[in-house]
């Protein structure tokens, strides 16, 4: 009888150890964060050519990136540099599907609101005041369902968008506001109004 009880305790102990190891195995997420170099972005202006006027320039770029599960990967501001007729900047991404939201030339008000973004639906709810806007104006673009792949150490990143694979993520941005000035002239004639 003591022998049967001893065997039961041993079997129970083995099952508990196996159960604990399986539970721990399921809790460890697969690290798929792209920790190597950041992904280069090629930013094209959708409505203007660079250099036309101050409104057609990009000075800073904020990349807000989410993975396919809607988890925030990156929400950072980096400087943008002009290379020929394309602005370039950097953004972090994960291996797999990414959704990129690019905001250029953010105002102080817009920067405060964008810094608080942690969920993908939050981006569409953000508004800002364009009163007193000075050049360069804020611009916005997005690339959804971009597939990022890289070596296991994060090097040699490639991005595929619309079945085209390249080492640079192409982004087209358009102005979020317009600045204009006008002069009103009333034609005064001696007749009736």
Name each model feature, range by range.
Residues 32-34:
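Non-catalytic accessory regions used for complex assembly or targeting
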Residues 18-21:
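C-terminal motif of bacterial Sec signal peptides marking the signal peptidase cleavage site
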């Amino acid at each position: 009888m003591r022998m049967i009880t001893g065997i039961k305790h041993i079997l129970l102990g083995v099952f508990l150890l196996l159960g604990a190891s399986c539970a721990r195995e399921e809790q460890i997420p697969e690290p798929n964060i792209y920790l190597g170099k950041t992904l280069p972005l090629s930013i094209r202006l959708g409505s203007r050519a660079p250099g036309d006027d101050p409104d057609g320039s990009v000075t800073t770029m904020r990349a807000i990136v989410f993975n396919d599960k809607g988890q925030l990967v990156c929400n950072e501001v980096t400087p943008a540099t002009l290379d020929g007729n394309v602005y370039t900047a950097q953004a972090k991404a994960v291996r797999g599907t990414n959704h990129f939201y690019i905001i250029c030339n953010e105002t102080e008000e817009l920067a405060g609101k964008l810094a608080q973004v942690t969920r993908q639906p939050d981006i569409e709810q953000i508004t800002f005041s364009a009163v007193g806007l000075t050049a360069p104006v804020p611009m916005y673009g997005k690339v959804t369902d971009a597939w990022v792949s890289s070596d296991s150490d994060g090097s040699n990143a490639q991005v595929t968008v619309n079945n085209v694979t390249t080492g640079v993520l192409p982004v087209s941005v358009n102005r979020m506001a317009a600045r204009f000035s006008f002069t009103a002239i009333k034609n005064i004639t001696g007749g009736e109004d």
